[in-house]
């Protein structure tokens, strides 16, 4: 239980979880429409923070533990992704996803590192992010199964836009600028 205003926390729990999941949906939909690499990562981060908040508002031990796991894991992964995005920007002088591409053919080591970060961000089983997201979804299912179903659906949506971004940036048509490894 949360020690501050436990009665109010219990009363408003469904509303707060609903708002948190709405934040996840909003972040995911806006990230889907992004053409800028850093903006896509920022809205993806917003979606992850919404899931963290939903885990906190379940008022269960599993929800809080999952939220903490997710905070730590997301912190490490998003820093790596933003760092990689900055490296890409400094080499290509653009953040537009459509203008990037073919980095794999020029920098295979960088592509491998970026892929590991993307897979961690989408909570591939075996990553620390998976533990956090799975625990949060489990705690949401204890409160209301529909919260967990909607939360799980947004995770699939997140995997779609992150893997699509990876495909366009790393595997897409080769950019004319040289990316030195």
Give residue ranges: language-model regions.
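Residue-level micro-sites within transmembrane alpha helices that shape
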Residues: 35-38, 47, 69-73, 77, ...
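Alpha-helical transmembrane segments of polytopic integral membrane proteins
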Residues: 25-28, 82-85, 159-163
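Structural signature of hydrophobic alpha-helical transmembrane segments
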Residues: 7-22, 70-76
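Helix-coil boundary and interhelical linker segments in multi-pass alpha-helical membrane proteins
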Residues: 1-12, 52-69, 140-147
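Helix-loop interface residues and adjacent transmembrane-helix termini in multi-pass membrane transporters
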Residues: 9, 34, 61, 91-94
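Interfacial and helix-entry/exit segments of alpha-helical transmembrane bundles
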Residues: 42-49, 77-158, 177-181
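Internal transmembrane alpha-helices of multipass membrane proteins
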Residues: 12-59
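Transmembrane alpha-helical segments of integral membrane proteins
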Residues: 162-177
């Amino acid at each position: 239980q949360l020690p501050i205003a436990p009665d109010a926390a219990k009363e408003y729990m469904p509303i707060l979880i609903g708002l948190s999941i709405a934040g996840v949906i909003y972040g995911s939909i806006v990230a889907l429409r992004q053409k800028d690499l850093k903006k896509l990562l920022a809205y993806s981060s917003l979606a992850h923070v919404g899931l963290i908040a939903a885990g906190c508002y379940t008022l269960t031990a599993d929800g809080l533990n999952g939220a903490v796991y997710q905070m730590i894991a997301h912190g490490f992964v998003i820093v790596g992704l933003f760092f990689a995005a900055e490296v890409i920007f400094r080499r290509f002088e653009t953040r537009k996803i459509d203008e990037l591409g073919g980095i794999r053919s020029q920098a295979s080591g960088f592509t491998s590192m970026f892929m590991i970060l993307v897979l961690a961000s989408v909570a591939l089983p075996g990553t620390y992010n998976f533990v956090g997201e799975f625990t949060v979804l489990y705690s949401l299912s204890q409160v209301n199964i529909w919260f967990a179903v909607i939360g799980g659906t947004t995770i699939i949506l997140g995997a779609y836009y992150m893997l699509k971004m990876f495909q366009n940036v790393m595997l897409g048509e080769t950019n004319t600028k040289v990316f030195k490894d």
